[in-house]
From Swiss-Prot:
GO terms for molecular function: RNA binding. InterPro entries: E_motif, Pentatricopeptide_rpt, PPR_At4g14850-like_plant, TPR-like_helical_dom_sf. It comes from Arabidopsis thaliana. PPR repeats lie at residues 88-122, 125-159, 160-190, 191-221, 222-256, 257-291, 292-322, 323-357, 358-388, 394-424. It is found in: Plastid, Chloroplast. This is Pentatricopeptide repeat-containing protein At2g42920, chloroplastic. The keyword Nucleus does not apply. It holds the Pfam family E_motif.
């Protein structure tokens, strides 16, 4: 008798015949050729359970492999895994690899330990170790990763390129460059994956010059090599170098990808280079890059940080699918550019859209309240975050509330909020209160805030500078000078200021007290003339430029 044929949502599943046994090969072909969604897979899985064919390890492992292909389906994958009675190495490797790429990498390690304890006949294989190293790297557990490294050496697999590269990447991800460098130096022959990992490691740890040296020495580069350097420059604040490297990348005829575009947009955002940002946007459209949420968010962020709000809104409105990151970037962009009411309205629109605001969403709307000085609405949003969305406020949220209260002159309430908040205080929140004290004119509270700031970080110049400025604004010049002298005695230097300007599609960066630009003499000469003109202008305009401003104004030079 031929088996009955059942059809579920486009997947045709043969049912158990009235007599005899049906081979699992038909189901395996269905999974390979017709199954494309978890809903369809679950229908096939149910039929396999009903027919008893799921007891076959090969069949069950194919179901498991389908589930493990997507990190979001690992809960179901684990359910399938626990029902497999005879787990072969393929089954163990599949579930470990799936969890190593999911939101629960610790499960990969836990299952690996179970594998070691399961049976003497089941041992880790060449394909097992890379997934476990990946999990250790994502968790930042280099210490446990070293123990696995020792196991690899004991098994004689340290020269396997696949294992070695994932091991090196684990050390790089955890910031253990010495161990990574030892593995790198022990390599025989050129391996572009290992070179790229070391470049990323140096850049991540702030050793961008070493990263560039290694990049320059590469016998052969691929797109990842260029992306690693460009993103490394952005990570280390060398935004102009990132744009310059992209030009070199184009000269070498290397095709960029979406990751390249996002890094370049971030560089333009920090530099305020709107012209170059627009060109990159046009490049993305012209070359038909996928406008996924990461690219769209980077575009919105770039336009907003360059002050081009309408262009940012246009990108937001035209986005094919608005993920939460797009909403958050637009809300924060509006808040930081003087469109506080529109930012709050957009937050309300976000709530109506069906998406649920997260902690970043509330940073955006509280920023709008801080800039507009709306204490009541800030308090409403703060309560909404905790009571409706069950989001515990972070130090950033409390700092914004201090800004709101301080800006409204409610210094006592702001100080009380800091002292009673359940999170650990930091220098930023006390700096915010100190700045508010300076504006309002509360000397005693300014002293208390500065004391707390210095206690948290004795080597931080911010407390001395802010308190000195506060004293000066109150007319207490002796006390202001005293703070500056204390900084000098303790050999504390304020971080060098930096600014940039875009002229004719070229970015010019300037740093305080520098003189490296070829036209430094001309720049200083012109600034001296401007300084003199400002000082001789009559009436109140000259009062806007105190002596400190005029002196500091002169000592800027292009990097």
């Amino acid at each position: 008798m031929s088996p009955t044929i059942l059809s579920f949502s486009g997947v045709t599943v043969p049912a158990m015949p009235s007599s005899g046994s049906l081979s699992g090969n038909t189901y395996l072909r269905l999974i390979d050729t017709q199954c494309s969604t978890m809903r369809e897979l679950k229908q096939i899985h149910a039929s396999l359970i009903k027919t008893g064919l799921i007891s076959d390890t090969v069949t069950a492992s194919r179901v498991l492999a389908f589930c493990c292909a997507s990190p979001s389906d690992m809960n179901y994958a684990y359910l399938v895994f626990t029902r497999i009675n005879h787990k072969n190495p393929f089954v163990w490797n599949t579930i470990i690899r799936g969890f190593s790429r999911s939101s629960f990498p610790e499960m990969a390690i836990s299952i690996f330990i179970d594998m070691l304890c399961s049976s003497p006949s089941v041992k880790p294989q060449r394909l097992t170790y890379p997934s476990v190293f990946k999990a250790y790297g994502r968790l930042g557990q280099a210490r446990d990763g070293r123990q696995l490294h020792g196991m690899v050496i004991k098994e004689g697999l340290e020269d396997d390129s696949f294992i070695r590269n994932t091991m090196l990447h684990m050390y790089v991800t955890c910031g253990c460059l010495i161990e990574a460098w030892r593995i790198f130096l022990g390599m025989i022959g050129f391996d572009v994956v290992a070179w790229n990992s070391m470049i990323m490691g140096f850049a991540k740890c702030g050793l961008i010059d070493q990263a560039q040296n290694l990049f320059d020495e590469m016998p052969q580069r691929n797109g990842v090599s260029w992306n690693s350097m460009i993103s490394g420059f952005v990570r280390n604040g060398r935004f102009k170098d990132a744009l310059d490297m992209f030009r070199e990348m184009q000269e070498k005829d290397v095709k960029p990808d979406g990751f390249t575009m996002v890094s370049l947009l971030n560089a333009c955002a920090y530099l305020g280079a709107s012209e170059q940002g627009r060109w990159i946007h046009e490049y993305i459209v012209r070359n038909r890059f996928e406008l996924n949420s990461i690219v769209v968010t980077a575009l919105i962020d770039m336009y907003c940080k360059c002050g081009c709000i309408e262009e940012g809104l246009n990108v937001f409105e035209c986005a094919p699918k608005k993920q939460l990151s797009c909403w958050n970037s637009m809300i924060l962009g509006l808040a930081n550019n003087g469109f506080e009411e529109r930012a709050m309205d957009l937050f309300s629109e976000l709530e109506r859209s069906g998406l649920e605001p997260d902690s970043v969403s509330f940073i955006g709307v509280l920023t709008a309240c801080a800039h507009s000085g709306e204490v009541h609405r800030a308090d409403e949003f703060f309560r909404l975050m905790k009571e409706k969305y069950m989001i515990e406020p972070s130090i950033k949220h409390y700092t914004l509330m201090v800004n709101v209260l301080g800006g409204a002159g409610l210094l006592e309430e702001a100080e009380a909020l800091i002292k009673n908040m359940p999170v650990e205080e930091d220098t930023v929140i006390w700096s915010s209160l100190l700045s508010a004290c300076r504006k309002i004119g509360n000397v005693e509270m300014a002293k208390r805030a500065a004391k707390c700031l210095k206690k948290l970080d004795p080597d931080e110049t911010c407390g001395y500078v802010l308190l000195s400025n506060a004293y000066a604004s109150y007319g207490l010049f002796e006390e202001a000078v005293e703070q500056r002298l204390l900084m000098k005695e303790r050999q504390m230097e304020k971080e060098v200021g930096c600014s940039s300007i875009e002229v004719d599609f070229e970015v010019h960066e300037f740093i305080s007290c520098g003189g490296t630009h070829p036209k430094s003499a001309e720049i200083y000469s012109l600034l001296d003339i401007l300084n003199w003109d400002v000082s001789t202008i009559k009436s109140g305009f000259a009062e806007l430029f105190d002596a400190t401003t005029r002196i500091g104004f002169t000592y800027l030079a292009e990097k």
